């Protein structure tokens, strides 16, 4: 049986040095907020919040169509927040192995398709579920309108993401230096 050595050499290091360096590097990139992708993300967040807040303030659980609208609106709102934070703090530069233009393209196309279905479901169910002119009717009508606007915003983002993925209007060096957003 092997015996343990009587002496073991160990090294210690301070974990605070590594943590402090990585935390200080997380500074918000205000250029992203001014970019087309940043402005569209803020628009998607604001309008998406309006969609699910307006639906949530009505008895939506009684109607399956509004359950779908709530799922789409809340899920895409949360995922958009995650992508917004990733790009705001330039975490996409640290996670360089992820093909971000392709990931965003897939997300925005999927979000556009999901919001098309949510908009159609929301708009089709408005007249069937509320008395015209009542508060739930007005809220659901407004939610349908904002769902249409969010759908358009995701569609525009999908178009810009497609251009970024294809590399239209830039070369690899400038798109890397610009952080991957227009």
Swiss-Prot record:
It comes from Mus musculus (Mouse). The keyword Chaperone does not apply. Main component of the myelin sheath that plays an important role in myelin membrane biogenesis and myelination. Plays an essential function in apical endocytosis. Regulates epithelial development through the regulation of apical endocytosis. Part of the intracellular machinery that mediates basolateral-to-apical transport of ICAM-1, an essential adhesion receptor in epithelial cells, from the subapical compartment in hepatic epithelial cells. PANTHER family: MARVEL-CONTAINING POTENTIAL LIPID RAFT-ASSOCIATED PROTEIN, PLASMOLIPIN. Phosphorylated. The keyword Membrane applies. The modification Phosphoserine is found at residue 9. Residues 32-166 form the MARVEL domain. It is a multi-pass membrane protein. GO terms for cellular component: apical plasma membrane; myelin sheath. Belongs to the MAL family. The chain crosses the membrane at residues 36-56, 69-89, 100-120, 142-162. Residues 1-35, 90-99, 163-182 are cytoplasmic. This is Plasmolipin.
